[in-house]
């Protein structure tokens, strides 16, 4: 009889279960308290109960655990310095959606060479998240599919659904199940209505199929996530200006949703020129000084060293520099955070 299935499958490998990985890298009571408390603080900011600003900042993607931990240690110092004005959360992105092809992140390809040692990548991701949380720094990530989140979601304080997946039904269903607040990016064309629709969908109860912590396919029914919000990330043109934010708030108001959102300084808002994140910051700071309460948070891409680099065979990489989108360097990061804290002073 002719085979009719898996005709284009080149390789099958068994995967560690989320439960097995959690046994190897368990959540300590201290980390559990830290994650729970940071989620509650973020929820209060998104609801307008806390006047502070949520600042989600870090590398475009994680590829080097040593550099990531050095960044986290520096970020913890900034958290301590500005905690009365800012809730600083580290961007820890392990999966990268690609427009066509390219490196898909630490979980998929931890060795950066196409060997796809996914089990090792999952170990590295969970290990790093534990270490960063143990420092006292909350973590943020993008949830790209229905499987990998099961391995790390218990260590995440804030999650994102990306511009390419906000319109996806399964991602909206997943967001309705996540235990952390979730931001939905506007579409790559700049359309914010799809993000508002996603927020509405994620607040509802859903049923979907997914592996559970033991790897068993399971029917999940969710209770809905009340902490969905828009991430203004720009599109064909930037959408961080006051009139753009007002228009987004009008749409939120139309559906009786909280009129609080997050502005992404990077991506479409900087038109892929990383130093323009500083210009976006200046504009957002002025809006805050002018009395805007809609801006609950910001996102920015920064690392130890400015710019980006390409992976070229076995050539050594520059330490602390992105291998995906270009990032601001550390000195600019300090300046950006200081400006945000100064602007937020006017809310108190």
Curated annotation (Swiss-Prot):
The keyword Amino-acid biosynthesis applies. One of its GO terms (cellular component) is cytoplasm. Its EC number is 2.5.1.54. The keyword Amino-acid biosynthesis applies. Keywords: Amino-acid biosynthesis, Aromatic amino acid biosynthesis, Transferase. InterPro entries: Aldolase_TIM, DAHP1/KDSA, DAHP_synth_1. It holds the Pfam family DAHP_synth_1. It catalyses: D-erythrose 4-phosphate + phosphoenolpyruvate + H2O = 7-phospho-2-dehydro-3-deoxy-D-arabino-heptonate + phosphate. Pathway: Metabolic intermediate biosynthesis; chorismate biosynthesis; chorismate from D-erythrose 4-phosphate and phosphoenolpyruvate: step 1/7. Gene3D superfamilies: Aldolase class I. There are 3 DAHP synthases, AroH is feedback-inhibited by Trp. The other 2 DAHP synthases are Tyr- and Phe-sensitive, respectively. PANTHER family: PHOSPHO-2-DEHYDRO-3-DEOXYHEPTONATE ALDOLASE DAHP SYNTHETASE, PHOSPHO-2-DEHYDRO-3-DEOXYHEPTONATE ALDOLASE, TRP-SENSITIVE. Stereospecific condensation of phosphoenolpyruvate (PEP) and D-erythrose-4-phosphate (E4P) giving rise to 3-deoxy-D-arabino-heptulosonate-7-phosphate (DAHP). This is Phospho-2-dehydro-3-deoxyheptonate aldolase, Trp-sensitive. It comes from Escherichia coli (strain K12). The lineage of its organism: Bacteria, Pseudomonadati, Pseudomonadota, Gammaproteobacteria, Enterobacterales. The gene is aroH.
């Amino acid at each position: 009889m002719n085979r009719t299935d898996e005709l284009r499958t080149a390789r099958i490998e068994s995967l560690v279960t989320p439960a097995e990985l959690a046994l190897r890298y368990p959540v300590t009571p201290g980390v559990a308290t830290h994650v729970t408390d940071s989620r509650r603080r973020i929820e209060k900011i998104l609801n307008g109960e806390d006047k502070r600003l949520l600042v989600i900042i870090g590398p475009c993607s994680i590829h080097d655990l040593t550099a990531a931990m050095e960044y986290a240690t520096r970020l913890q110092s900034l958290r301590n310095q500005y905690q009365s004005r800012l809730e600083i959360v580290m961007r820890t992105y392990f999966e990268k959606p690609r427009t066509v092809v390219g490196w898909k992140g630490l979980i998929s390809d931890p060795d950066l060479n196409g060997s796809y040692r996914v089990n090792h990548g999952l170990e590295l991701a969970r290990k790093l998240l534990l270490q960063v949380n143990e420092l006292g720094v909350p973590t943020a990530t993008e949830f790209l599919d229905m499987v990998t989140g099961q391995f790390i979601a218990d260590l995440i304080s804030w999650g994102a659904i990306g511009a390419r997946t906000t319109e996806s039904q399964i991602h909206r269903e997943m967001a309705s199940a996540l235990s952390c607040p979730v931001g939905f990016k506007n579409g790559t064309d700049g359309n914010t209505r799809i993000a508002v629709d996603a927020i509405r969908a994620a607040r509802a109860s859903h049923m979907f199929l997914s592996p559970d912590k033991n790897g068993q396919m399971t029917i999940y029914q969710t209770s809905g996530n009340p902490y969905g919000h828009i991430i203004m990330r720009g599109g064909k043109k930037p959408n961080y200006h006051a009139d753009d934010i007002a228009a987004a708030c009008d749409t939120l108001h139309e559906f009786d949703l909280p009129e609080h959102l997050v502005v992404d300084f990077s991506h479409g808002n900087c038109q892929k020129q990383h130093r323009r994140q500083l210009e976006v910051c200046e504009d957002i700071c002025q809006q805050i000084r002018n009395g805007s309460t809609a801006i609950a948070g910001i996102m920015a891409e920064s690392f130890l060293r400015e710019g980006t680099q390409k992976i070229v065979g076995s050539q050594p990489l520059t330490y602390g520099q992105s291998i995906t989108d270009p990032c601001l360097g550390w000195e600019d990061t300090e300046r950006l955070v200081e400006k945000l804290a100064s602007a937020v002073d006017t809310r108190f």
